[in-house]
């Protein structure tokens, strides 16, 4: 019986150690930008690696700066929804298909939730331009990031005036 308890204790300690190591590795991967954060992130909080990757994928104009970013993909390069100081941008690059769509802030006539998500499902924000075109953004609801993202779009586009 004592031998069984020793073995069970060792196995339990190994399991706890593995879980701790996985959580630590995930945290490091998120902080370094190798794995996308599960939350909406302010531009000044993004790792420089992610900022450069997003600028490339979203085809930034010279001097353009990120205000908010969210990725629904495993990596920031695979998918991005971005608010900059000039545009609202959505891009996808899944390896076989890549596209990038955007609206200039001065062209935005409306921005609203099409669907309010929760911890497990992203919210959908529809941004409409004055010419009738629109852009759908998928934004994480965790820690009210979707509300902060939408409020920032409205403020940047002058819709709250």
Regions found by a protein language model. Name each.
Residues 1-18:
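N-terminal Sec-pathway targeting helices
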Residues 23-81:
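Anionic N-terminal interaction surfaces
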Residues 69-123:
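Phosphoinositide-binding peripheral membrane targeting modules
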Residues 111, 133, 155-158:
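Non-catalytic accessory segments flanking enzymatic or RNA/DNA-binding domains
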Residues 142-161:
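Terminal and domain-flanking low-complexity segments
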């Amino acid at each position: 019986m004592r031998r069984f308890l020793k073995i069970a204790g060792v196995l339990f300690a190994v399991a706890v150690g593995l879980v701790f190591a996985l959580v630590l590795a995930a945290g490091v991967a998120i902080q370094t930008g190798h794995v996308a954060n599960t939350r909406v992130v302010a531009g000044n909080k993004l790792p420089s690696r992610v900022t450069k990757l997003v600028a490339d994928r979203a085809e930034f104009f010279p001097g353009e700066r990120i205000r908010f970013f969210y990725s629904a993909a495993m990596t920031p390069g695979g998918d991005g929804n971005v608010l900059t100081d000039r545009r609202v941008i959505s891009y996808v690059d899944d390896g076989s298909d890549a596209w990038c769509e955007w609206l200039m802030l001065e062209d935005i006539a409306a921005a609203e939730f099409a669907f309010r998500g929760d911890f497990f499902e992203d919210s959908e924000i529809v941004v409409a331009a004055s010419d009738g075109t629109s852009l759908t953004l998928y934004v994480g609801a965790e820690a009210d990031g979707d509300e902060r993202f939408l409020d920032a779009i409205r403020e940047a586009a002058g819709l709250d005036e």
